[in-house]
Amino acid sequence: MVVAVMAPAAVAQVGYEPTEENLQAREAFRDSGFGIFIHWGVSSMLGRGEWVLNRDDVTLDEYERLAASFYPSRFDADAWARAFKASGAEYITFTTRHHDGFSMFATEQSPYNIVDGTPYGRDVLKELSQACARHGLKLHLYYSHLDWRRDDYVPLGRTGHDPGRRSDGRWSDYLAFMNAQLTELLTGYGPIGAIWFDGLWDRDEQPGGMDAELWQLPQQYAMIHRLQPACLIGNNHHVTPYAGEDMQIFERDKPGENTAGLSGQAVSALPLETCQTMNDSWGYRITDDNYKSSDELIRYLVGTAGRDANLLLNVGPRPDGTLPEKAVKRLADIGAWMQTYGATVKGVRGGPVAPHEWGVTTHRGRTMYVHVISDSTDDAILLPYTAAKPVKACMYDSREAVPFTVTPAGIVLRLPAAAVPDRVVELTFKTNI
């Protein structure tokens, strides 16, 4: 075997110099390892996912009427925060406004929001912000660049072509609307860990449709960094990061993979994050019971950490404000695993050995964690690492010594059998890796 060392590609951030606060926030973000994505809004009432307005036989007029009946009477921000914190997550990313244009916070920019446009009348984002502060979670905010409703989102892209939709507004008005809402979010809800943009890809078939200047991204990003210098900016545009972005996002794939067809871009030197669903849906879909097993999700988390990325795992709450029972069970199972193994996927960095068929590695200081996550029953693996010799090897959980042999090809580890989703070997070296 050939030694494989992880080496992310560099991405030029021309014209953008992050502040010291921002650089520190990036490292804190990398340390966090695990976050919870929350896709929730009026679309949950139909139980057909967050894209129902674009994909199903629902007109814009019919969809807008949903708000008049949206009343999540069982929403409990503290219950959510407790479940998320117990899972081992360090932050949440909440959908403040998805592509349907409905705002899940108190905004003066449009009456189409949860406070002014529903009988519920409560600012769920404010309640979540306060609950996150109480339970030690950082708050990140999802915000859609794409809008399927407003008449000033012009020209239309490849989605949101409702037959009755008007598109005779001014693009400059839409840009001003977004910046006004972002200002509200960054000045009214305490410290925000990141703004998570989505939807730029809607214009990817138009010449220049994703140009930063068309969207005035330099001005928008500068405004965000001015309002909260430590706030990171990520954009799920499925291309290499633009100047002003502080993290790189991968959708439904770990960095370096592209099984979903959305993540073919080069892996940058920025902090990395992979977003993934528990079942097959982002927003609540009543018929989607295809949940990944707890072991599968744990292995996905480990595989993401081994690629030096965070995992942002999605939950789609029901219209009454509760979390689906299977989602709660998965969170609890991940949390139980984190009680023992959390230190091997949080506060670490991926590598130094690239992912292999048997699993991945993470490291901190002079310690390397070898995560064996394959279903193979082999009791020996070759770790193709020749930069240094370990002085000690043991199973992370039991501290049982692991016999090892140093060869020209690397380190051969002989593992005890164990019925766990991730067998973790701790290797100690004389100096930092």
Each model region followed by its residue ranges:
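N-terminal signal peptide c-region/cleavage motif recognized by signal peptidases
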Residues: A7-P8
